[in-house]
Amino acid sequence: MTIKLAIDCMGGDHGVSVTVPAAISFLSSHDDAEMILVGLPDAIGAQLKKLHATDHPRVTVVPATEVITMDDPVEVALRKKKDSSMRVAATQVKEGKADACISAGNTGALMAVSRYVLKTLEGIERPAIATTIPNEQGWGTTVLDLGANADCEPGHLLQFARMADAMVSVVDHKEHPTVGLLNIGEEVIKGNEVVKAAGELLRASELNFYGNVEGNDIFKGTTDIVVCDGFVGNVALKSTEGLAKMIGSMIKEEFTRSWFTKLLAVVAMPVLSRLARRLDPARYNGASLLGLRGLVIKSHGSADAHSFEWAIKRGYDAARNGVIERIARAFAHKSGAGGAATGSPETDAPNPHPDSRAA
């Protein structure tokens, strides 16, 4: 089975200088992958020449004449830049030419463009952004939503949980993964009305619901999945990133304070190296836009080639394991957010493959 990946080569802070080398490097370790490099042909070609990959048999260059910058508002991305590398890459997925799209571009634009081009799966009202955050268990906690939906209804949180359950089941090979609802306490009576109502829906659902969890449970690995609205999730994610940078900076500062601490650093290097590998942010790069009729992976905008390659791997793994089909089946007999609250059945099974109706 060949996995074809459409790369938005112009997205992110570094564009082709990161995306193209990452794509070529990924091909060297994955014989069943093909790359569709989307963007300005001259810029992509120059990078391929540097990498001696101009005639790579598993690389196709698809031209796009426009670039969505990190500062472009959503309306510009949607209405004015219709031939952007981001949009063309998403269209490759819609037309069945690619199995997944990976972009380091503007998050808001990517969500808007992807939703416009691919549409949502039937039964899903709102797509959500999900990623994995490292935990003490070593396998990471899947957290969503991370910013796509600042305000949610209880049924939306139930839908997010179902989408994450489907993804974790096939990608991480965990049958019946545990689901936690992010709250200000474990007690059922804690939280605002939306969270309390969402808890009732989750307890009544077919999911393996653990109950309410707190922020520290994300890092303890108390549950496989943690669900929250996009406002809370984005704050949690940015706080995590900030804390990680601060701790790294403080450790470096302390170990370089004097000749003695530098000597200690040499002695502690094996331990520090193992810790660095466990907490390497590059390994967790790549957030999945769940709920669409095609796979879209969002890389961190400041990612280097090593980090972007991990985002490519996330798209590859999701495509290889049939995440879209699994989510579609999970919602085949479920309704939208309102129906999810009442448990009414959905009459039409979702179509996991984009077609002319998703134009």
UniProtKB/Swiss-Prot annotation:
Location within or outside the cell: Cytoplasm
Entry keywords, A to Z: Cytoplasm, Lipid biosynthesis, Lipid metabolism, Phospholipid biosynthesis, Phospholipid metabolism, Transferase
EC number: 2.3.1.274
Pfam families named in the record: FA_synthesis (PF02504)
Subunit note: Homodimer. Probably interacts with PlsY.
Record family assignment: Belongs to the PlsX family.
Origin: domain of life: Bacteria
Annotated pathway: Lipid metabolism; phospholipid metabolism
UniProt-listed GO biological process terms: fatty acid biosynthetic process; phospholipid biosynthetic process
Physiological role: Catalyzes the reversible formation of acyl-phosphate (acyl-PO(4)) from acyl-[acyl-carrier-protein] (acyl-ACP). This enzyme utilizes acyl-ACP as fatty acyl donor, but not acyl-CoA.
Region feature (Disordered): 335-359
A cellular component annotation (GO) from this entry: cytoplasm
Keyword ATP-binding set for record: no
Name of the protein in question: Phosphate acyltransferase
InterPro entries: FA_synthesis, Phospholipid_synth_PlsX-like
Example of a GO MF term: phosphate:acyl-[acyl carrier protein] acyltransferase activity
Catalytic activity: a fatty acyl-[ACP] + phosphate = an acyl phosphate + holo-[ACP]
Record PANTHER family: FATTY ACID/PHOSPHOLIPID SYNTHESIS PROTEIN PLSX (PTHR30100), PHOSPHATE ACYLTRANSFERASE (PTHR30100:SF1)
